[in-house]
């Protein structure tokens, strides 16, 4: 099965202690669907790039991974409909 769906996900946290941040990052580092994780400025703390086969797979990731991290206070999912330009190296 290939990648059929790319989702950019913003994550807001309710806890900003070192332990909360480390726990979030440890979970994300061990999750294969997450291909990028960026700490960002603004109203939320993280921006993730998630690559899955379909919307059903994304729902499973949303529930089984993000849904198990107690410090997450907000999740916004942005589904990529089409890509006009992508200069990243393709493997």
Task: List each model region and its residues.
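A compositional/biophysical signature of low hydrophobicity enriched in polar/charged and small residues
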Residues: 1-91
């Amino acid at each position: 099965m290939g990648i059929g769906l790319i989702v950019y996900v913003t994550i807001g946290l309710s806890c900003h202690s070192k332990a909360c941040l480390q726990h979030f990052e440890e979970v994300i580092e061990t999750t294969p669907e997450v291909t990028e994780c960026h700490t960002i400025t603004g109203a939320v703390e993280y921006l993730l790039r998630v690559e899955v086969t379909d919307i059903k797979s994304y729902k499973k990731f949303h529930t089984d991974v993000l849904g198990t991290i107690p410090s997450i206070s907000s999740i916004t999912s942005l589904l990529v409909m089409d890509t006009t330009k992508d200069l990243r190296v393709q493997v």
